[in-house]
Amino acid sequence: MKRLISTLNLSKEDWLRYRKCGITGTDAGAILGLNPYRSAFQVYHDKISDTIEHIDNEAMRQGRDLEDYVAQRFTEATGLKVRRANAIYQSEEHPLLLADFDRLIVGQKAGLECKTVSPFSADKWADGKIPAHYMAQVNHYLAVSGFDCWYIAALIFGKELVIHKITTDKEVLNNLIAREEHFWKYNVMPEIPPVPTGSEGDTQQINQLYSADDRNKTADLNSIRDLLDKRQELSDQIEQMEQEKMAIEQQVKLQMQDAAYGTAPGYKVSWVSSESKRVDSQRLKKEQPDIFNRYSKNVRSRRFTIIHAA
């Protein structure tokens, strides 16, 4: 691998722009369909767009702020010294592959990926497990670096520090590289988007692309009539299954009667009373319009409906 550019004096905008020039570690899981928070469809639109999006949230902020601490805990636990990479790296054999490494292991052909994890996601790391999109990220780093192994240290808030060592598996890396290069060659380069997979990320991206509507236009959907038929078939099946599910729940309730809880091997059932207060918005708008307007806001969205005309 080679150092593409130092990140020591690189602005956040330039850093993001360089990442558009190839596939990075955080792209890998999305391209493979393994990332629950990002899709290949989103990666595609990020790569072809000239817009630099500064996406950030509290979890990402904490991850950055605590990276030093996780690296320090890793050194304490393993005795391995680490150093900052301070660069965007590029695979010499596969120039499309780029990487930003959290840390490199001193004196070894190895690196370290630091993660911070909510305690609510601790089960995803239980019993030696590693989330699939993080495995893809680490394997991407192994592909770029040509190193022998990579460590991943995950700090689960309030619980523990989990450390795993992932060794190079040539078959896995070759498959990953092939998938990434296929994505770039057949999607990004010709600007042909991958087919949406039904993920929440795909929905967000599509809604962002087409947030406004033209009510003077009607699209001819005859070419995808088969998709509409398939959707209707699925809707009918879902409706039937929902009814069957509700019938089962009704039988369970009849069995429980006034019991708040029920048990069966492998199951815990609860049927408990709860109270909640809800604002009567219509009455508030009528009787206190000033207060209603003061605390109301306009939310713009496009409502999507399909009506089947038999």
Predicted regions and their residues:
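Accessory terminal regions of nucleic-acid processing enzymes
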Residues: 1-310
